[in-house]
Amino acid sequence: MYIDIIKNYTPTNELEAQDKKVMLAYIERHQDDILTRENEIAHLCVSGFILNKKLDKTLMIYHNLFDSWGWTGGHADGDSDLLAVALKEAREETGVQNVRPLSELPQSLDILPVWSHYKNGKPISAHLHLTVTYLLIADETEQLTIKEDENSGVEWIPVEALNQYCSEPALLPIYMKLVEAARKLLQFTA
């Protein structure tokens, strides 16, 4: 169950430990709608940080909403299988079908702000994404496809060039934390 996955997650730093604590407290009070967008203050989201097999490139999409290159992901929309959501979103948003988890367990927990915006002509108030992130591996030779209603680009970006592509500075430390986690996992499983 998704709550157990979050409870059993081992934070990598103090900020993650605090985010985990806040997430669990909020989930406890809002179990009836935390997996849906009906909770307009905060809801569970899932991201997939996709790397190539060498771990030197990451597959990013150009988010129309955030006007920046970033990871794949989306709302749980009632699905409590968070890894399945991460894989589904990765496939839908990039066109890559042969994507697999580097680990069955999440590698990051983050509370991220989403500023007010319009989606499909309707106003969306500012809110929080309680984000659970999985590390995914994909074949960089596979054909990429843009999902026009969400992104306007899909590209393999060298890890060392992320700061040149990502215009959301708060996400860069998270991305680098995930690259490091992937390298540790690959060392451990090799």
Regions found by a protein language model. Give the residues of each.
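N-terminal strand-loop-strand
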Residues: 36-71
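A short, polar/proline- and glycine-enriched secondary-structure boundary/capping micro-motif
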Residues: 68-74, 156-157
